Amino acid sequence: MGTRDWLTVSAAAIIMLSGSASAAQLDGVTLPDAVSLDGTELHLNGIALRTYSWLGIHIYVAGLYLEHPSHDAEAILDSPEKKLLAVRFVHNVDVANARQAWREGFEDNCRAPCHLAPSDVERFLAAMPSMRAGDHSTLAFTREGLKITMNGKTLATITDPMFSRAVLATFIGPKPPTPRLKRELLHNTK
């Protein structure tokens, strides 16, 4: 292939990438508009910033990816479709605070008839490390269960559908960390 052919291929690749490479940005974190999960394309439903305390300390940016975007939290939670929550930390979080936040989220969003196996909760919490600014985590929800990764490394896989629902509910359920986080992940402007 000659120089002219390489230039043509390169120009075509740049045109294709520029047409399809769009992204959302928040607090210096860029998330793609679409990701692939086990061969299924998921679309960015909403992007949100998690803040803490009245000081508004920025903790992480999260993006919720769905097969079919929706503003309806219950429909998303009840859907068997694949979902992915991408989290990019912008502040350090120690392991004790992370585990306590998860415990509170489960207590607030897993009310009867929701029941989580204590062994699943403990395995999930035990897998949680301290987070540093720049770390990235994914929570992948499929029919097979929940897969949690941190910086590309699998931390845990839990197959209970109720557990998967409860984890996602901690972000978009009745009592999210902040109403704004839920509203932005659902891309609701109300």
Language model: regions and residue ranges:
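Flexible glycine-rich active-site/ligand-binding loops centered on an Asp-His dyad
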Residues: L155-L181
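Bacterial N-terminal signal peptides
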Residues: T8-S18
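Cysteine/selenocysteine-centered motifs that mediate thiol-based redox chemistry or coordinate metal-sulfur cofactors
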Residues: R180-K190
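N-terminal export leaders
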Residues: T3-L7
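N-terminal secretory signal peptides
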Residues: A23-L77, A112
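Mid-length scaffold segments of soluble, non-membrane domains
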Residues: E67-R143
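Short strand-turn-strand beta-turns centered on an Asx-Gly dipeptide
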Residues: T149-G152
